[in-house]
Amino acid sequence: MNYSLEDLPNSGKNPRVYMDIVLNNEIIGRLQIKLFRDAFPAGVENFVQLTNGKTYRVNSNGTGKYKYNRHINRTYEGCKFHNVLHNNYIVSGDIYNSNGSSAGTVYCDEPIPPVFGDYFYPHESKGLLSLVPYTDESGNRYYDSTFMITLDDIRPSNVLDELDRDQVVIGQVYGGLDVLDKINSMIKPYAGRKYPTFSIGKCGAYLDSSQAQRKRPVNVNGTKRFLNKPTRVN
């Protein structure tokens, strides 16, 4: 399943997602994030769908009698935070190699152009989620699955004010700020210290009441009915 940049899915104006943060195979906490669709619609939808993890990339064509295709699941689950900076930010989102070398999108891995919404949010506080851009060979700027989360409020001693030049804030952590504090304390630089490797565990989107409502099955003709009709128990 893939999406098109011309026909965006709609997860609502301010969808909410969660991410469990893992260290040494143990969950150290959960981040709850509210997203701002009006800041960057295509970027927000890409982020939401990657937390849901229900899109796939065909890795190779199958062989043999049944010719099964091999698929790679596009998801943030399992992604490492491959770039960290104390009192500044943590970076993740490489859904293929988990080292910052191969990000992607749910739009058939097509890059997302910088078509922003009507609102702009500066990098001024802790817990802001923003998308990290890259520049192609022609000098054009695009976005993909790479994101960062700020670890502190803006200060003269950090570089958050520089992020507004090309990164775009698409959300904010509203639950789990203590988890960010814990991460920040563990990446404080000391001589010869090796930073721990954090990764994303289980993640997903919170459904609103309309999305969470159970719907009746639909048959091939489009009529709503139960496909397996229950039988009476005597």
From Swiss-Prot:
Question: Per its UniProt record, what InterPro entries does this chain match?
Answer: Cyclophilin-like_dom_sf, Cyclophilin-type_PPIase, Cyclophilin-type_PPIase_dom
Q: Name one GO molecular function term.
A: cyclosporin A binding
| Residue ranges annotated for the PPIase cyclophilin-type domain, each copy included | 18-205
The alphabetical list of record keywords is:
Host cytoplasm, Virion
Give the UniProt entry's GO cellular component terms. host cell cytoplasm; virion component
One GO biological process term is: protein folding
- Main localization of the protein described in the UniProt heading: virion
Q: Cross-referenced PROSITE patterns, in alphabetical order?
A: CSA_PPIASE_2 (PS50072)
Gene3D superfamilies in UniProt = Cyclophilin-like (2.40.100.10)
**Annotated compartments:** Virion; Host cytoplasm
Family membership: Belongs to the cyclophilin-type PPIase family.
Q: How does it assemble?
A: Homotrimer.
Report the protein name in the record.
Structural PPIase-like protein L605
